[in-house]
Amino acid sequence: ILSFVFLTISLAFTNNNVGKGNVQLALLQYRGGGDWYANKETSIPNLIEFCNRELKMNLNPEQAIVEAGSPEIFNYPFIHMTGHGNVQFSEQEAENLRTYLKSGGFLHIDDNYGMNPYVRPALKKIFPDKDLVELPFNHDIYKQRFPFASGLPKIHEHDGKNPQGFGIIIDGRVVCFYSYE
């Protein structure tokens, strides 16, 4: 559900298609065996339903699936990525994602537990000069329509660690949000 916060932010950069049902959200298909399809039947469909019902957004009700290296990636203002394991991007895929994010796209990565040691090196391949930075609870990303004054809610109860939100920021804009734990 936290994804709608990021969706709202990313859609602020799109044109007037939001109210016409033309904006479609996508699930990122990646290589490496990290089950990119985890929660495929629920994550984005539930987000779309919530945004259309609660935020009156009129998003396209069908999620898309887009490969990291595809030029189709530029058709989607919001891309969701999840999984439990290995993530690999070729040089071409990393370049495509870098261009997408620098051009106004937004990537939300949800650690479905076990993704952390793989997604961090994959992000370094996309942005070798950028680090994931923990976003403090007073960051604007937690102060949207439904504020999270105490930061991320705990979703997975695997190891008792507190949830954390990390971002990659370019020119003051969060282009990637990584919800960990």
Predicted regions and their residues:
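An acidic, glycine-rich "communication" segment
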Residues: G32-G33, N116-E181
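Structured segments of extracytoplasmic/periplasmic soluble domains
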Residues: L47-N58, T82, T99-S103, A122-K130
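Extracytoplasmic/secreted proteins, especially bacterial periplasmic and envelope-associated proteins
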Residues: T42-N46, F50, Q92, N96, ...
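Bacterial N-terminal signal peptides
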Residues: I1-S10
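Short alpha-beta junction capping motif
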Residues: L25, F78-P117
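Aromatic-Pro/Gly-enriched surface loop or interdomain linker
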Residues: F13-F78, T82-G85
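Surface-exposed patches in mature extracellular/periplasmic domains of secreted proteins
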Residues: M57-E67, I109-N112, K130-F137
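Extracellular/periplasmic catalytic domains that process cell-envelope and extracellular macromolecules
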Residues: N16-G21, P71-N75, L101-K102, K161, ...
